Regions:
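Regulatory N- and C-terminal appendages and interdomain linkers associated
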Residues: 1-73, 279, 284-469
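Conserved ATP-binding subdomain of kinase catalytic cores across diverse folds
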Residues: 28-31, 37-47, 58-219, 258-260, ...
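Short, contiguous strand/loop micro-motifs
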Residues: 22-24, 123-125, 223-224
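Active-site-adjacent bridging/hinge elements
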Residues: 8-14, 106-117, 204-208, 272-282, ...
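ATP-dependent phospho-/nucleotidyl transfer catalytic cores
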Residues: 131, 161-247, 258-347, 351
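Hydrophobic HxD+1 residue recognition
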Residues: 249-250, 255
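Residue-level "edge-of-site" marker
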Residues: 52, 154-155, 253
Length: 469
């Protein structure tokens, strides 16, 4: 742990931005998951399991870190209805440290660590199933090239929880999440709602200093910051589409200003292409359906722009906000082609390919992940596609425009197509029935082998796709 570099930057914002809280005492602390790859990025990979549990189960502070955890304050639009009673209701910012690989700031924050002033009558806990689901989401998305938070640790707490949306009583857990930031659009919204322009300016300066240092000398910092966040969030939205991912609850309090996916709830991956596919049973209107995710992100970014008006002007911010759709339209072909391991040809050709691809995917209902697995490398994947379970789809007339386009694209460098992963018949997927199949033996007989196997297969996929931590 000699290289571990803790910092206390968020604490410098002051008490107007957080509440100092205490972690809940748990009857048991059973280590269920520790991410050694990311622990190494922090310099804590050599902690013993006992030391790990002390910090990430009992939340004993690291030397040089926060003396007490910080429950962060924020508001947010939930399904487009404003809620001023939000905040960290079952988690807190526990520590910050410098990423030893790239020098960037990393937050360690919790989920399920107990009640806070923002719990709103809830128990402040996380179910073990919820923790397992978050591990699977973050690992899978990282392997698919999506900018995501990471699940650093999961500790089972020995508690029995009552929940209305899953069989109860159910086992409890506490998760530690890594993300470069836990500043949300809702963090800015709270300050705008309270009419605190000085604090908005302070938060903006903090965000620029630690997450967008290239903007320190910008002539109009609010506009430059907005455009940078738009770029990150639009890219994240395009990556979701390319991964076939549905977040489920795209409220403004769930959108990170660094464009990292986090706050996973009822997430799902698409079985087949369906723009109307929803992840949350309570999303009755499809507001956050697969195909409407870019629209939801654009709406949320508009709310961020509104918060910055007191520091700038509508006229100055509008050009940055107007880049949302152009940035997404540019990011989507790039994300899809990156998944296929192909070099872009140019905006018109790439847009035509995207249109042909989704027309085919909708008409054929080819399994979403299977297509990207089969055609990794474009024409270089023809032999793999020919032996695929989806091969019949590729013989159809609707596939012809896609086949022609794939022939036109050149492969990217270092595709690694001889990796053993590409000898499989089917790719590793994480559909809802697979998630349930991983969870069932844990719930029934404390059998974690299914989770360990899934994580090993995801690691193989990540290696095959050349995704670095």
């Amino acid at each position: 742990m000699s290289q571990f570099h803790p910092v206390k930057y968020h604490q410098s914002l002051g008490d107007a931005f957080y509440d100092r809280v205490a972690p809940a005492p748990f009857p048991k602390t059973i280590l269920r998951h520790r991410d050694q790859r990311w622990a190494a990025r922090l310099g804590i990979e050599n902690l013993s399991d006992e030391q790990w549990i002390a910090h990430f189960g009992r939340f004993e502070p690291f030397p040089g870190s926060f003396e007490t955890p910080l429950a962060l304050r924020y508001h947010g639009h939930q399904f487009r209805s404003y809620n001023p009673d939000l905040g960290d209701g079952r988690g807190f910012l526990f520590a910050q440290a410098i990423d030893l690989a790239d020098g960037r700031l990393l937050d360690m924050a919790t989920k399920g660590s107990g009640r806070t002033p923002w719990s709103r009558g809830a128990d402040g806990r996380l179910t073990l199933k919820g923790g397992v689901r978050e591990i699977l989401a973050t690992e899978m998305l990282e392997a698919l090239g999506v900018n995501t938070s990471k699940s650093l640790s999961l500790v089972e707490t020995g508690e029995e929880l009552e929940r209305g949306d899953e069989p109860s009583p159910t086992r409890g857990s506490v998760l530690v999440r890594l993300s470069h930031s836990h500043i949300r659009i809702g963090t800015f919204q709270r300050l705008a709602y309270l009419e605190e322009p000085e604090n908005i300016a302070q938060l903006l300066d903090y965000a620029i200093e630690h997450y967008y240092p290239e903007l320190v000398d910008a002539a109009d910092k609010p506009a430059a910051f907005l455009e940078a966040v738009v770029d990150r969030v639009a890219t994240m939205g395009a990556q979701w589409i390319a991964a076939g991912f549905v977040h489920g609850v795209l409220n403004t309090d769930n959108i990170n200003i660094t464009g990292e996916s986090f706050d996973y709830g009822p997430w799902r991956f698409l079985p087949t292409y369906d723009p109307n596919f929803t992840a949350a049973y309570f999303d009755e209107t499809g507001l956050y359906s697969f195909g409407r995710q870019p629209e939801a992100l654009a709406w949320n970014l508009t709310r961020l722009a509104e918060c910055l008006v007191p520091l700038s002007s509508v006229e100055a911010l509008e050009p940055a906000l107007n880049t949302v759709w152009p940035k997404f339209r540019a990011a989507l072909p790039a994300a899809l082609l990156r998944r296929l391991g192909l070099q872009p040809l140019g905006s018109d050709s790439d847009t035509a390919f995207v249109n042909a691809l989704f027309t085919f995917m909708l008409a054929s209902q080819t399994p979403y992940e299977q297509f990207f697995f089969d055609w990794r490398g474009g024409a270089l994947g023809a032999e793999r596609a020919a032996r695929s379970p989806a091969a019949a789809h590729y013989a159809s007339e609707t596939f012809r425009p896609v086949a022609d386009a794939l022939e036109a694209y050149g492969p990217a460098e270092n595709l690694n197509l001889d990796h053993p992963y590409f000898t499989r018949e089917r790719p590793r997927t994480m559909l809802i029935d697979e998630v349930e199949a991983i969870w069932a033996p844990i719930a029934q007989s404390d059998d974690w082998s299914g989770l360990h196997l899934a994580l090993a297969e995801i690691a193989e996929m990540r290696e095959a796709y050349g995704v670095k931590p």
